[in-house]
Design a protein with these regions (language model features):
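Extracellular glycan-modifying ectodomains
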Residues: 12-14, 44, 71-88, 96-102, ...
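Phosphate-binding active sites in nucleotide-utilizing proteins
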Residues: 29-76, 80-81
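Structural recognition of the beta-strand scaffold that forms the well-ordered cores
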Residues: 17-22, 26, 46-52, 88-94, ...
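N-terminal secretory targeting modules
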Residues: 1-21, 26-27, 40-44, 224
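Extracellular protease catalytic domains of secreted zymogens
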Residues: 102-113, 117-126, 144-161
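Catalytic His-Asp segment of secreted/periplasmic serine-dependent ester chemistry enzymes
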Residues: 100, 146-224
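Extracytoplasmic/secreted proteins, especially bacterial periplasmic and envelope-associated proteins
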Residues: 29, 33, 73, 77, ...
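Oxyanion-hole/transition-state-stabilizing segment in secreted/luminal serine hydrolases
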Residues: 58-120
Length: 224
C-alpha cells in the first residue's frame, strides 16, 4: 500500500526490526519472502521493514519532472528512512541504477555520461552516506551485492566490470558487519554476468519470483 508508510506498535523489549534498503529490486518481494521465512522458522521477535524506492541512486537524483518518480538520492533518503523504531540491522542493496542509468545527452538529455560513477565514488558514497549514518544510529550494517545485468538494455562490458568491482568491495570491506551475497545466490555459475536459469524476470535486471525467494533464503539466519 503506497499510502501507508509505517505502523509502530508497543511490544516486548526483545523484539527488533531488520531494515531492507534499496531500489526497485527491494521494492518487490524478497523482503516479503524474508518476513515469511522468519515466521515459518518461528522467529517471531523480528519485523522485516522495507525501505525501497524504484529508480533511486546512491549519488545523484534527477532534477527534471520527468524522472521525479525515481526519488531522492541516498544522502537525502537514508537519514529519513532509517527512522525505524527498534531497528538493529540494515541490509543495503543499492547502486545498480547509478551504473545503468547514464546513456549520454545525445540519447537522453537528463542522463549525461558525467553521471557515471567510478567504483571508488560508489564505495565512498556507501561509506559516507550509509555506513557512517547507520553507525551513529547504532545499527549493524550488511552489504548486499548487486545482481547480474547482462541483457539489460543499457548493458555493456564496462558497466558490468564496474558492478563486479563494486561487488568485490561489498564482499570484502571491513566497514560492514557482513555481506549478503545476492549476486552469488542468483547468478549463473557458468555465465556469472547473467541470472541463473529461472531467476530472470525477463528484463535481465529484475529477478523472477523464484529468485526473490532465493534472495530471502540467503540472508543469514542470525539477522532474524
Amino acid at each position: 500500500f503506497y499510502f501507508l508508510n509505517t505502523i509502530d506498535i508497543l511490544t516486548e523489549p526483545d523484539n527488533h526490526a531488520l531494515i531492507c534498503y534499496g531500489d526497485s529490486i527491494t521494492a518487490q518481494s524478497w523482503p516479503d519472502w524474508l518476513a515469511l521465512r522468519a515466521w515459518n522458522e518461528h522467529r517471531r521477535h523480528v519485523a522485516v521493514i522495507r525501505r525501497a524506492v524504484c529508480g533511486t541512486r546512491i549519488l545523484r537524483q534527477y532534477d527534471c519532472i520527468t524522472y521525479q518518480a525515481y526519488g531522492l538520492r541516498g544522502a537525502t533518503r537514508f537519514p529519513i528512512e532509517m527512522n525505524v523504531s527498534g531497528a538493529t540491522d540494515v541490509i543495503i542493496q543499492h547502486g545498480i541504477n547509478d551504473i545503468i542509468h547514464p546513456v549520454g545527452t545525445d540519447v537522453n538529455p537528463f542522463r549525461p555520461w558525467s553521471d557515471m560513477p567510478t567504483a571508488e565514488e560508489l564505495e565512498r558514497g556507501v561509506q559516507d552516506i550509509y555506513v557512517e549514518h547507520a553507525r551513529r544510529l547504532g545499527l549493524r550494517v550488511w552489504s548486499g551485492t548487486l545482481l547480474p545485468i547482462e541483457g539489460w538494455r543499457t548493458y555493456n562490458a564496462d558497466r558490468d566490470k564496474l558492478r563486479c568491482e563494486f561487488n568485490t568491495w561489498l564482499r570484502e570491506s571491513p566497514l560492514f558487519d557482513g555481506c549478503v551475497d545476492f549476486d552469488r545466490a542468483l547468478r549463473d555459475p557458468d555465465h556469472p554476468s547473467q541470472f541463473a536459469p529461472g531467476y530472470d524476470s525477463g528484463d535481465h535486471l529484475h529477478p523472477s519470483e523464484e529468485a526473490y525467494k532465493a534472495m530471502a533464503a540467503c540472508v543469514p539466519g542470525h539477522l532474524l
